[in-house]
Amino acid sequence: MYDSFKTKKTLKIGKKTYTYFSFKAAEKNGLKNISSLPFSIKVLLENLIRNEDGTTVSVDDIKDFDNWKTNKKINREINFRPARVLMQDFTGVPAVVDLASMRSAIMSEKGDPKKVNPLSPVDLVIDHSVMVDKYGSATSYKANVDLEYKRNIERYEFLRWGQKSFNNFRVVPPGTGICHQVNLEYLAKTVWSEKKKIKNRNLNLAYPDTVVGTDSHTTCLLYTSDAADEVDG
């Protein structure tokens, strides 16, 4: 992590100290015209500042945001890294098959298959599968879920193996709710935090929760720009 604009600041909440990336510090240290950016653009910029490594994210990538207010565009690819990935079963199961195939290929070359894992945390919500065979009684819900497990036992055994085998991968079982509901009520964190080792120091990072979904309308919770300004102060 380069932190070319010296943006790292700390915030103490209770007994924990969190490190975040301050826009005020970035402006003070040469990154101009960013305090009035739209909040969605601020989220992208914070992502680049936090992940600056000189290779996938360079100082020039970050500086390009200086001109966004004037041009309303950025003239380069943005290497955005979401905090997490949300999948439903139609697209998620093939992805787990791909990961398993990659592990098999590495194993055949005498490599370590355990090195193949999602880089970002992934939640796979099984919400497209349950059929309605029983209805009109208090036991209908349980009966339909039980039938789903019987019909697709191989799929669920495979996904259980995936959850146990891969890092950064969780499965939400059928009958829990649709992925958007589960995301909003259980998975979304608004502010994401993680422990990360940076220059031999263990830091608790805090940053906006962002999600990439394998669905046309995956929803995400965000804290408001007012709240962001308060934290930045």
Model-found features: residue ranges?
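Acidic, Ala/Val/Gly-enriched low-complexity intrinsically disordered segments
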Residues: 231-232
